[in-house]
Amino acid sequence: NIDYTFKLTYAVNEAVSIYGGISTGFKASAWNISRNSDPNASEVAGLIAAGTPASPNRSVGRRYAGPEEAEVIEIGAKIYLPSGYLNIALFDQTIEGFQSNTFIGTGFALANAGAQSADGYEFDLVYSPLENIDLMMSGTFLDPVYDSFTGSSFGDISGTTPSNIPEETITTSVTWNWNMNGWDGYTRLSHLYS
């Protein structure tokens, strides 16, 4: 598999740069090693042909999922502020053969979705109002969807939102950097909303 990344950046001035790009990626096959790792139909036939008795309490399942292929298109800006910075980005991601590991009550079922996509935006802001105080806020806002997933453990779930992918994630923190008796340290208070 050959993947690529192509990006362009333009410096508007000393404080602002804008960029855009496209990237592809690959994730190798995955194996289900949970207690629900049942052999598929061809594996059961092979076991029986080899003289291995088929267990009556086992069912035909999915032991592995094929590889994923991803493509991401992104545009954004990096802005330096007098006492910090702001990064913002818009993106559109598509994954063909998305590896879904779905909880089914007693274990997990591994399967490939036809396609899963997510578009959205993210930001990262750091501001230091005083020399020893840093304020940080970052966020990601997604619209994830199974574009095509006809072979899930629950039937055709195309058009639904994948589980365990939050649509909104916001992180904030306040950091106090201090020096006391020759010791450097910091105290941080942070919060995650998802």
How should each PLM-predicted stretch be described?
Residues 26, 32-46:
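A surface-exposed, glycine/aromatic-enriched loop/edge motif typical of exported proteins
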Residues 8-12, 24, 67, 77-79, ...:
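Residue-level signature of outer-membrane beta-barrel architecture
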Residues 1, 31-37, 98-106, 142, ...:
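Outer-membrane beta-barrel translocator domains and adjoining extracellular loop/strand segments
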Residues 1-11, 16-17, 23-27, 91, ...:
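Surface-exposed extracellular loop regions of Gram-negative outer-membrane beta-barrel proteins
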Residues 4, 14, 29, 64-67, ...:
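Proline-centered helix-kink/hinge sites
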